[in-house]
Amino acid sequence: VSVGNSLTSGFRDGALYLDGQNESFPSMLAKQMGLAGGTQTFTQPLMPNNVGGFTNITGFGGKYTLQLVDVKDASGSVVGKKLAPVQSTAAATLDIIGGTGKYFNNMGVPGAKSYHLVASGYGSAVNLSLGKANPYFVRFATSATTSVLADAMAQKPSFYTLWIGNNDVLSYATSGGLGVDQKGNLDPSTYGSNDITDPNVVASVIKNVILGLKSANANSKGAIANIPYVTSIPYFTAVPYNPVPLSSASASTLNTSFSAINAKLKSVGMAERFSTLTASTSNPVLIIDKSLTDISAYLPAQYAIYGQARHATANDLILLPASSVIGIDPTTGLPPTSTSTKINGVTIPLADQLVLTEKEAAKVIAATDAYNASISSLATANGLALVDANAKMKELGTTSGIQYNGVKYTASFVTGGAFSLDGVHPNGRGYALIANTFIDAINKTYGSTLPWVDINAYSGVTFP
């Protein structure tokens, strides 16, 4: 049995769909265990199509596909084509495939945070409208009152994988830090959807899951993975902090405005917030940083929008959705004309939800480190294989990447070969890499000889 979230389910390209599920890392592990004499069957709550999403639930669209889209100039005329991810329309309504006695070996629930695994009613259709249930678990839960852990325990697994805790920091990060760091608050029922879970809550839940699975089968063995840093994935690394091209004249005009604000800041004993821009293609984007003191009341009216603005630094993470916003005139949705005064990321600060600032990223890293310390301790205390997913994702994020049978894999968006089009989840080959990381840990801990999966045999990004 495999317990976890989207990374366990095979979610990729922004959706859960059939082909992705068939290339989930647990299904790959099951096949390799089958080669070694283990069970030949591994059941998954398969989606009814290869698009994903739910037509009757807002916010659950279909998968992203790579398509050639129009490139327009400032007048709206099409001047070329470019490759870009485009989200599909959801293909079907929510289908119920669970029920009494209907168990699935893959218990990965996209969107689940640690404490959701032990929440009764997380698979209740009635609770969906209350925000207390998850449609993916509603699909395959054995009852409206069960929990993910209860359904996993009922299967009395002889071997299990557990990978949970990613979403406890990820939703905060992908929202650009719009949530709250709940460190010190042990009551998840009071959390917002984008909050960082208190590390003690995560540790307690994971301990209870392990003890629950052990109580279901005293002879069970297992592998538990730690949490990768968000700085390892393309959603946070694909867009540079300094992608703004400026002419000499534009740089000079902007410098005049920003230097005046810097002078005002300096006069009241505050640090400067704006860089000196140059005639180049690598100027920093203008962002909102809500940790800054708001000085809008002390600025001339035309500068009031810069009250909590500054230029980004190399330590800020610009989120992937910003790539379609930076350099665009917000009044037209098109590239700026020679007379445009409003340009996203240049004269108009990027919205807070499009940037994970250095301070916000530090909160994510600190929470991740705390989660991982607990995961490591719990693995040791319970004799489980510890899968260092964090180290593997760091390795993937290096320039040299990871080599496999003549193919180089990196964390670069689209071109790196390991991540799907949502920039967060791996593609088939990325999940195969994860499967091999699990296999290495399992073999090391239990003395088994499970063979690696062939990474190159699985699917990558599909080009049109």
Regions found by a protein language model. Name each.
Residues 1-464:
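Conserved active-site regions of diverse hydrolases
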